[in-house]
C-alpha cells in the first residue's frame, strides 16, 4: 500500500505538470516582457560567488554552462558540443563554434581555461568547490579543452553543468573586478541591463545568441517581492507573470484560478534537523535512532506543508534516479523510540538545543519536532537567531542541532551524499563518520555507468539512514504558478527557472 501511495504521489506530481501544459494550442510569438516574481534578491550574479536558489533563476538566463540539462535533468551538450573520458583522470571537451559573450568577445578554449583557473585561484574566494578535482586545464586548440583530474571521477560533466561550468566573459571580469557580480556578462539567451537592489533585475534578449530558437522574449524583469502574500497577490492581479516556489498554503487556491496555470512535482531537497553527532548524547547511534522513531513525518507534511511533498526517511529524494523505494520509509514508533533511548544510556530522556534561523518554515518544523520529541521525554530548547548567526555556529561546530533545508539542485546523488555525509564533505559540519559510506561514495565517483553507481549510492544511503545521521522530515515539491499567457517554461525536479524557449501569448 505504501509503495502504491508513493508511486501515486509522484504520478500526480507529473500529471500536474502535464495538465499545466495541456492548454489550448497557441501560435508561438516573439516579443514581450516576462515579469518573474521571486521572494529573495540574489547576493551576486557572479556564478563563482553566489549560493542561493534565487540566483540560479537569473543565472541560467545570463549564462550557459559547458554542459546543460534537459527537462528531465539528464546531461546534454551546451557550450561543449561533446566530451569524452579518455582515461580515468582525463576528459576532452569539444566546444561549440561561433559563440559570443554579451560584450562581443569570443567564447573559445582560452576562455574556458581562464574561467576554470579563476575558480581554482584562492584569491577569487569562489564558493564553488566542485572543480577542486581539476589538476590542470589545457587549451588543446581554439575549440578543444583537456581537463586533467587529481583523482579518477566520472562526475566532471555534472560538475560543469553547475556553477563551475557557467562561463563568464574573461574580458568583462578582468575589467570590472569585484563589481562583476553586479554587472554580469555571459553567453546566455538574455543579457544584463540593470539591477535595482531589492527591487528588480532587468535582462534583454541577446540577438547574437548561438541558439536562435531559444530567446523569444524582448525582456525579462525579475521583481523582488519578499512578502510571499504580496507576491501571490501580484500574480493574481497580473503585476507579475510567473512565480516559482509557490507557498504551499496557496497552491489549492491558485489551481482554481482560471487565468493561472500551476506546476507541481516532487523535488530533490528536504527539510531536516541537522544533528551534530560529534557531541553527546547525539554521538550515540541509538539515541539518534530514538529521535528518528519519534518523529511523525506524514503528520508534519499534512499539517505544516499542506501535503505538498513526501515524507523523508533518508537524504535521497523519490525523484532521484538512485532512490531505493518505499522500503526506506520509517513509521513513528514511540515504544521503540523509548527502548532506543535506554539502549543509548538516557532512559529518562535528555535536553538539547536546536538552532533555528529566521526562515518561518524552519521555526514551524522546529516547533513540531519539539512537541513530538517531548512525548519520549526529550526536551528541545529552541534557540532562535538570525540565519547568519546560525550558519556561523554550524560552521564552527558549536551547536547541537539546527533546523534547516537542503535545496536539492543537482539530480546526481553525489551532490548530497558527498558534501553532507562523506567524512571529507564540504558541508559535513556535524562530524558524521562512517568509513563504509566513504568507501561506497568514493567508489561511485569513479564510475560512469548509472546502474553501477545507483547500487553503491543506495547502499550508502541505507547506512546513513540506519545510522540516523540526521532527522529528515519531508521532501517538498517544487512548484510554479503563471499566467496562462506564459508558455515554454518547464518545471524540473531541481526547481530552477529556465527561460530558454519561453514565450508570451499575445
Regions found by a protein language model. Name each.
Residues 29, 84, 94, 128-172, ...:
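Surface-exposed binding/hinge segments that line
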Residues 92, 379-390, 415-484, 506:
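Extracytoplasmic/peripheral linker and loop segments enriched in polar/acidic and small residues
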Residues 205, 256, 263, 282-371, ...:
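Append "and occasionally in soluble cytosolic enzymes with long acidic Gly/Pro-rich linkers
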Residues 480-506:
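Long beta-strand-rich cores associated with HINT superfamily self-processing modules
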